[in-house]
Amino acid sequence: MLIVLSVGGSILAKNLDPKHFSAYASALKELARKHQIVVVTGGGVAARNYIDVARGVGANEVVCDFIGIDITRLNAQLLIAALGNTAHPEPPTTYKEAESALASGKIVVMGGVIPGQTTDAVAAILAEYLNADMMVIATSVDGVYSSDPREDPNAKKFDVMTAKELVGIVISTEMKAGSKSPVDPLASKIIERCNIDTIIMDGTDPQDVLEVVLQEAVKTDKVTGVRLGTRIIG
């Protein structure tokens, strides 16, 4: 099974802790024993800090995006270092390069690709391009809610939802000042378009990601919920 995993920078590189990179590497190695794995890493706090400085000195948003992409690739290189010879040695910089890297039989780790695309959007486009069997978005929340749970104490968590429902929630949440959706609008639209089996889950503990993916990869019933997450169905 080919699995694309999007790991947010705030999850993977929150404190730039070597032990956390190593823990993620261990989980990925275990997954790779049975599956092909492609990982897209985010930029996290470091990317936001650099982008803030860039804006402060007058850089436009495209330049800021390129800076963010550079940071995502640094995080990718750190994870590659933790994976050792089980990983393709360089992070691909295009979708075609990622496809070629898969032929190595190793875990492929990459960062951003082009300005205007978030980590989740890159992962969704990549999953569609590669005809992946599953996409997992490892984020800082345990699934999709009816509204931002940080802002609304009555927010309801979905165990299972359609891609169309996801798009609606993402758009309505993003329109509210200060609220943040679990994925960005472009990623949600790509998920809807390509109809890929998608899980959005809390990725703080890489062992949780390992457990959920191993369980879901062998399920024949793809309309049931998942622990620590939300399943997106067509």
From Swiss-Prot:
Activity regulation as described: Inhibited by UTP.
Pfam families: AA_kinase (PF00696)
Class in the EC hierarchy, top level: transferase
Binding-site list for ATP: 9-10, 44, 48, 139, 145, 148
Gene3D superfamilies to which the protein is assigned, alphabetical: Acetylglutamate kinase-like
Binding site for UMP: 43, 65, 113-119
GO biological process: 'de novo' CTP biosynthetic process; UDP biosynthetic process
CC annotations in GO: cytoplasm
S-S bonds: none
Pathway listed: Pyrimidine metabolism; CTP biosynthesis via de novo pathway; UDP from UMP (UMPK route): step 1/1
Superkingdom assignment: Archaea
Protein name: Uridylate kinase
Gene (name only): pyrH
